[in-house]
Amino acid sequence: MKNITILGATGSIGTQTLDVIRREKEELKLVAISANKSYKKVIEIIKEFKPKYTVLMEENAFKIVEDFCIDNKIDTKVLKGMEGMIYISTLEEVNTVVTSVVGMIGLVPTIKAIESGKDIALANKETLVVAGELVISKAKEHNVNILPVDSEHGAIFQCLRGNKKEEVKNIIVTASGGPFRGKKKEELIDVKPEHALKHPKWNMGRKISIDSATLMNKGLEVIEAHFLFGVDYENIKVVVHPQSIVHSMVEYKDGSVIAQMATPDMKLPIQYALNYPNRKESQIEPLDFYKISNLTFEKPDMDTFLPLKLAYEAGKKGGVMPAILNGANEVAVDLFLKGKIEFLQIGDLLQECMNKFYKSMEATLENVISVDKEVREYLGKKYDI
């Protein structure tokens, strides 16, 4: 039996993780969850799974859930804030922490979980983007597995199993291309949030949907792959694959390419991470190769989708630059969703902040938190938010 904590249990990944646990009750037990403020969803989770601990970040949501548990004589202990997230990430009885919260908020609980010897099922890209070197070194120090939950890194992880790192030539990360695949800059001038949120293949949260539309999501995955698999940026390629059947590939020095293929369904990488190193029977629709008419691959347009280009630049620069990129992107996406900036301004703001805030500093926890705060305060004043 594996005991599980889910950070971000009410979001897209968290909800699908609950689906996996629901199907595998004999092997997986939900011990603790966190959420921001979706108290109605949290109450439903408490009713069904009866976790020992629940954390809410927002004060009003915390009070509502706490009152519900008291009134209904439910034993779930309700905690709040970052202190609560760290507490449930370091519980002695927990084996695996699923980090599916969005943004920098996942960084400190993930590091604390690693220091407590927990395996990490990682869906929070920002943790590795801003502090990848620190996270990976901590994982090695504490003999902890970092198990990627997203489809691309989960695919690469599987393609690398049983092979030697020195035999790898290139990692090939696939991208669906998002809702604006094939568009040029001039065609994206009047894009509204409702257009950018319509992903052709995946049902995701609002922030990651916008990142997919700008290809920033793929840029974050490139940086993540660099740290997860120890491969130079020159050897991490992005290809646009609109069918989303090939989830990523590894090219070896002898010319062989190993690809992981599956029906696009996030439950598969989640299930693989939670059951690692074993594979379990899945309810995911199997691939029918007779129905797959074609698989196509295209070169990404980095001029139109500037955030992808900037992610490569930030990764190669290293230090705190990925943290600057990430902080600026989180704010820029929020500004776009609120109608305060245009779609193409997202890339412009990333470029502006990278130029303004770069310092030759090691990516320590203190440094990345500090520079992230600087970027957010600057953009907050600029746009009065």
From Swiss-Prot:
- Gene3D superfamilies from the entry? 1.10.1740.10, NAD(P)-binding Rossmann-like Domain
| Record has Transferase as a keyword | no
**Residues annotated as binding 1-deoxy-D-xylulose 5-phosphate:** 125, 151-152, 176, 199, 212, 217-218, 221
Q: Which UniProt keywords apply?
A: Isoprene biosynthesis, Manganese, Metal-binding, NADP, Oxidoreductase
* Enzyme category, top tier: oxidoreductase
Q: What is the required cofactor set for this protein?
A: Mg(2+); Mn(2+)
Note whether Manganese occurs among the keywords.
yes
* Reactions catalysed: 2-C-methyl-D-erythritol 4-phosphate + NADP(+) = 1-deoxy-D-xylulose 5-phosphate + NADPH + H(+)
Query: Binding residues for Mn(2+), per the UniProt record?
Result: 150, 152, 221
Reported EC number(s) for this entry are 1.1.1.267
In which pathway does this enzyme or protein participate?
Isoprenoid biosynthesis; isopentenyl diphosphate biosynthesis via DXP pathway; isopentenyl diphosphate from 1-deoxy-D-xylulose 5-phosphate: step 1/6
Identify the HAMAP family for this entry: DXP_reductoisom (MF_00183)
| Xref: PANTHER family | 1-DEOXY-D-XYLULOSE 5-PHOSPHATE REDUCTOISOMERASE, 1-DEOXY-D-XYLULOSE 5-PHOSPHATE REDUCTOISOMERASE, CHLOROPLASTIC
Q: Which family does it belong to?
A: Belongs to the DXR family.
Its job: Catalyzes the NADPH-dependent rearrangement and reduction of 1-deoxy-D-xylulose-5-phosphate (DXP) to 2-C-methyl-D-erythritol 4-phosphate (MEP).
Q: What is this protein called?
A: 1-deoxy-D-xylulose 5-phosphate reductoisomerase
Q: Which gene encodes it?
A: dxr
